[in-house]
């Protein structure tokens, strides 16, 4: 396994692992970079790529994902964050917009998510979870108490 982080003008990281046995070999690798744009109070932008390869006997399954994130403080209390994740194999995108407000003893989070609908997956319905959570468009509110 490799876990490397460099904090310079641009932040860079790599997390990689190889898991090998008699019948299988799993390779996981993630590389990413981040930078704070000198706009307003600073806009943090981040990009990350992850690849997973799983070989079992003569079969191989590969998954690839890319994620982008932008985060911006709005004063001392509020923060706006956008995250977009792309499944490169299935051509799906998952998008999240979060407005958070942090106070001394609690925080409030409003999250809008836009994800593929159940019908967008090439998977039989009986293999999909029974819950609708994570499918389509959703709005979530979280109250977090910090004690």
Tell where the protein language model's regions lie, with residue ranges:
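Membrane-embedded beta-strand positions in outer-membrane beta-barrel channels/transporters
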Residues: 1-3, 30-32, 67-69, 96, ...
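Detector for outer-membrane/organellar transmembrane beta-barrel domains
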Residues: 5-87
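A generic beta-sheet turn/junction motif
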Residues: 7-8, 90, 101-105, 147
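Generic detector of contiguous secondary-structure segments
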Residues: 22, 29, 91-100
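C-terminal structured domain segments
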Residues: 94-118
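Outer-membrane beta-barrel "beta-signal"
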Residues: 99-101, 110-112, 133-147
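Solvent-exposed loop segments that connect transmembrane elements
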Residues: 119-132
């Amino acid at each position: 396994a490799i876990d490397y982080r460099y904090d310079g003008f641009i932040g860079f990281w790599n997390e990689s692992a190889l898991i090998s046995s008699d019948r299988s070999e799993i390779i996981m690798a993630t590389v990413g970079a981040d930078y704070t744009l000198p706009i307003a109070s600073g806009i943090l932008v981040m990009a990350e790529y992850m690849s997973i390869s799983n070989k079992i006997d003569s079969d191989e399954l590969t998954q690839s994902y890319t994620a982008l994130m932008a985060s911006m403080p709005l004063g001392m209390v509020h923060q706006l964050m956008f995250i977009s994740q792309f499944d490169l194999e299935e051509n799906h995108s998952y998008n999240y917009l979060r407005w958070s407000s942090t106070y001394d003893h609690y925080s409030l989070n409003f999250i809008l998510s836009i994800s593929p609908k159940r019908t967008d997956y090439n998977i039989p319905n009986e293999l999909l979870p029974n819950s609708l959570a994570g499918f389509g468009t959703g709005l979530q509110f979280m109250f977090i108490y910090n004690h």
